[in-house]
């Protein structure tokens, strides 16, 4: 077993809107019941709107956009990110979208499949109250739509994020993340939280080296058990 260990996990700020008690409680339970005890202190739950974070003096290295595959950041949480990290001028809220789409064109020919992850620098010219260095573009859907049919969407997305952070050239020690697919995607908070923490668990513990089906099936079956949540 090739274990990456505690060091593979950055500090996560998990953000749920003030009124979204269900996601907050689902995260709290999943951290306790699913995530390895060695990384429990890596997660801080925040019940607030994104725009309230600067007043709390929270800063992070990386902000995650659980976006669509085309990098259009004009709705929901992505719009809140666009407004927080806005450029100058009348169309300043489009600056983040334009930089995101330029990076997508360069690295992915303009389309990032769901559950893939691309890291890009936060543009120097935008407002940056969180002092973030990197935007993690992490599509949970091709276009804004119900994604609840995609049973292991959150697990795959969280794994992609963790691995992108692991392989990034410079250390990313703190990450701001909201629910994956729980808005427009209609993924249930319980499934989202369970799959996020399962991905963390399996990432920390490592996938068996030279594994057989006997080795990997217990890992896969743990994910399968979340499908009905």
Residue locations for each model-derived region?
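Macrodomain-like recognition of ADP-ribose-binding/processing modules
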Residues: 1-229
